[in-house]
Each structure stands twice: as structure tokens, then as C-alpha cells.
Amino acid sequence: MKFFNNLFKKESKITVASGSKRVRISNSFLMFSNLYEAKKPLKYVLVYLLSIINAFLLLIFIQKTGLYSFGISSLTQGFARLVFVLLKSFDETQRLLIFNILYWLLYVFINIPLIIFSYKKIGKNFTILSTHFVVASNVFGFLISIIPGSDNLPPMLASITDTNFWKAAKDLNQSAGFVPFLWSDTSQGNVIISTFIYAAIYGFYNGISVSLLYILGGSAGGADFLTQYYARKKNRSVGSILFYVNSFILIIAILIGSFVAGSLLLQDVNNYRDSAWEVSLFFSPNLIATFFSILLTGTVVSYLFPRYNFAEIKVFTDKLEEVRKALLSDNANHSLSIQETLGGYSLLKKKMIVSVSMYVEIPHLIKIIRQIDKDCLVSITRIRGIDGHIYLRQN
């Protein structure tokens, strides 16, 4: 026993094998990890960039195809489509102006009480960042939509597809966006296929966009204010909540903007008069494609923004006490324990810090650790399940 005690106290010289060298490795299973600690100017630049892209894609993939976006915005889209149909006695220019005001700007005004709610219940920074996105994306969308000739803006997919798909996409683009496609109409086969492709593209993009907004500390507004509040209160993943809330709102939106508005149009068209007010008109390809898009968005958000997934962090450092004090001064109340280890080469007793943290907090913790010890080893292990109480940072 005395021999081993003396052995542990002795500094062992470790010979590095020939052909080996010490290298720095840094990887993360958290997507966009650098953006979690982004400075405020960069956050606003990215928010406005996302808002411009969002406005353009909404015009191309949603407004012109009869699809719907998600949350409360789908209600304003459905209402705008219904009003456009009801105002058939108005001049075409007036109808389009009213339609675009309702489609884009009404959503901003509906967000006002939700913004107040968010400011009081969630926080100042989150609400301000979200408000910038809501206002910017819808104002940009409105300005683009009133540009002369924007009604004839061709779909983005048209130039990279074959002749048949181009024809289908062109027909889709020129439709009013108010009449749902019919499963029974074989002539619309290519158009229905292109609708699902559009829904997939928008759903995937929207998942990335929403995730980036969450990572930056904001949201897309509307129902997001409510889902974020509920997710933080119940400590649940945002992705699944988004799907259920958006699905419920979407049913109402399609009932107004596609079923009612579409039936009012079809009853004046001889060839399709019998399809008006049919149940099949409600369960149209537009509905299924939009649901598919929502599901895809929720899946992408759950993957890119795993807020309530946890990981175990192990810190192997020679500056243990300083790192410990830095983590404690962070005021996040992380679980923190210190374990003894035995070096496999040196047979020296050392200590390491072990902590359990949410995925989204890992970049922040690593930043704190690196400020103390740039050469320490940080090991991160996924936790598949957890049962018990843990302190969570609320902002």
C-alpha cells in the first residue's frame, strides 16, 4: 500500500508515441452554437435578413399557391382571401390593395396584445427581438406585393425543372390562390405534386428560420408568443407544441380562406359548381400539404433547437478551483459536483468537474470555462433521460 501511495505522489514522465502529436479538437452536436452568444448588433442584422427572406418566400410559396403559413398569420391569410372573393364588385386594383393590407399588415395589429403579454410574462429582450421580426417581415412582404408586376412573379422552381413541371408550376402560380385543388380532378395531378414540393421547401426553410430566431433570443411572433410562454412554464420542447397549436389554428384558417372562399367562387363556375360546399373541398391537397409543411417545421425546430434536451459536461482542468468559482458566479444554479480521477499514464490523482445542463446552455458554459483555462478538456455526453429536479435559466 505504501508503495502505491508513493507512486501516486510521484510525477511520471509520459513519452508520446512516435508519429503522434497533441492537437486541439472542438466540435458540438448543437447546431449554430456560435449564435447563442451572438452580440446584439449581429442579432438584429440576422433578424432583418431573416425577415426579408421570409417575406419573399411567403409571397412565392404561400400567397401564390393557396397554401398557408403557420399560426395566427394563417388566420389573416384566410380572412384576406375570403374578403377578396366577397369584394368582387370592386375594382381589381382596389381588391388587391385591400387583400394585401389584410394579408400582411393585419397580422401586425393582431400581434399588439400578444406583444404586451409577452413583454410582461416572458421578457423584454425576447419581446423586442420578436417584434422587430414581425413588423419587418410583414412590412417587407406588403411592399413587395404592391410592386407592379409582382402578381406575375414566377415560382423559383420553374427554371430548374422539366417542361411538364414548369407548366404545372406556372398554372399554380397564376391561380388565384383561393380555390383549393381537387383530388378528383385528374388534370391537376402535376399541380398537386408541385404544391407538396412547395410545402416541403417552405416547411424546411421555416423550421430553420424559426430555430434561428429562438437561438438569437426571439421568435416569429403570433402564436409563438403563446407557445414560448407555455414551453417555458411547463419545460417542454417547443417543436411539439408548435405543431398542435398551428394545426388547430390552421383548421379555422382553411375553413374561412379555402372552403368558404373557394365554394363561393366555384358555385359560379359551371364545370365545378357541384364541388362547391363539398366536404372534399375542405380536405383538399392544400390542407394536407400545409399540414405536411407544419410537421416538417416542427421536426426541424426540435432538431435544431433542443431546448429541453440535457447533457452531462465533464471538465478536466488544472485550474479546478477557479473554474468552479466562475461557474458558481454565473448565477445559473447548475448542478455541480467534483469527482476524483486517476491518470492512466501518470497514475496521479486529479479532480474533474461534472455538471448537467441543457443543450442550449452548453456554448455559454464553455465560454466561461475557456476564459479561465484555454487548455482544459471538456467532454459532453448526451443524456437520453432524466428524472428529478433541476434549475433552469429562464432567459
Curated annotation (Swiss-Prot):
Localisation per UniProt entry: Cell membrane
Topological type in the membrane: Multi-pass membrane protein
Domain of life of the source: Bacteria
One Pfam family matching this protein: YitT_membrane
Annotated keywords: Cell membrane, Membrane, Transmembrane, Transmembrane helix
Positions of transmembrane segments: 42-62, 67-87, 97-117, 128-148, 196-216, 241-261, 281-301
Gene3D superfamilies in alphabetical order: 3.30.70.120
Entry annotated with the keyword Cell membrane: yes
UniProt GO cellular component terms: plasma membrane
Stated name of the protein: Uncharacterized protein MG443
Organism: Mycoplasma genitalium (strain ATCC 33530 / DSM 19775 / NCTC 10195 / G37)
Keyword Transmembrane: yes
